[in-house]
Amino acid sequence: MAEKLKVELVTPYKKVLSEEVDEITATGALGEFGVLPGHAPFLTSLKIGELAYRKDGVSHHMALNWGYFEVENDTVTVLVETAEKADEIDLERAKAALGRAEVELKALTPEDKNFRIYEAALERALIRVQVAGKATRR
């Protein structure tokens, strides 16, 4: 059994992460899950949420948009629409997006064609605000 997981995280635009990590957690379609070295092969879809990993005793956090997460032979492949590291998120911009999405949603009903668009924008902004507030910890 390997002692580390090899993680490759990519978006359609760039490779965001290529690291060997001790453990990783993410938000799947059915809830949060974690992966350690030696995990069985696994494939799931991801929803808007947080990805966290530990490397050498330090926690790192990222905000993710929808995508896929695969584990095979101690290699984790993550393909997502967008990914932002906690220290790269502009907190004021994320808070402004959260406020705009809240205002738009209040004016809509679930039957409106744009309701789901603003609901997803609200989810993204909320995750970005939460992740931006997490400092790297030992």
From Swiss-Prot:
It is a peripheral membrane protein. Keywords: ATP synthesis, Cell inner membrane, Cell membrane, CF(1), Hydrogen ion transport, Ion transport, Membrane, Transport. The keyword Cytoplasm does not apply. The keyword Transport applies. InterPro entries: ATP_synth_F1_dsu/esu (IPR001469), ATP_synth_F1_dsu/esu_N (IPR020546), ATP_synth_F1_esu_C (IPR020547), ATPsynth_dsu/esu_N (IPR036771). It comes from the Bacteria. It is found in: Cell inner membrane. Pfam families: ATP-synt_DE, ATP-synt_DE_N. One of its GO terms (molecular function) is ATP binding. Its main location: membrane. GO terms for cellular component: plasma membrane; proton-transporting ATP synthase complex. NCBIfam families: ATP_synt_epsi (TIGR01216), PRK13446.1 (NF009980). Belongs to the ATPase epsilon chain family. F-type ATPases have 2 components, CF(1) - the catalytic core - and CF(0) - the membrane proton channel. CF(1) has five subunits: alpha(3), beta(3), gamma(1), delta(1), epsilon(1). CF(0) has three main subunits: a, b and c. Produces ATP from ADP in the presence of a proton gradient across the membrane. This is ATP synthase epsilon chain. It comes from Geobacter sp. (strain M21).
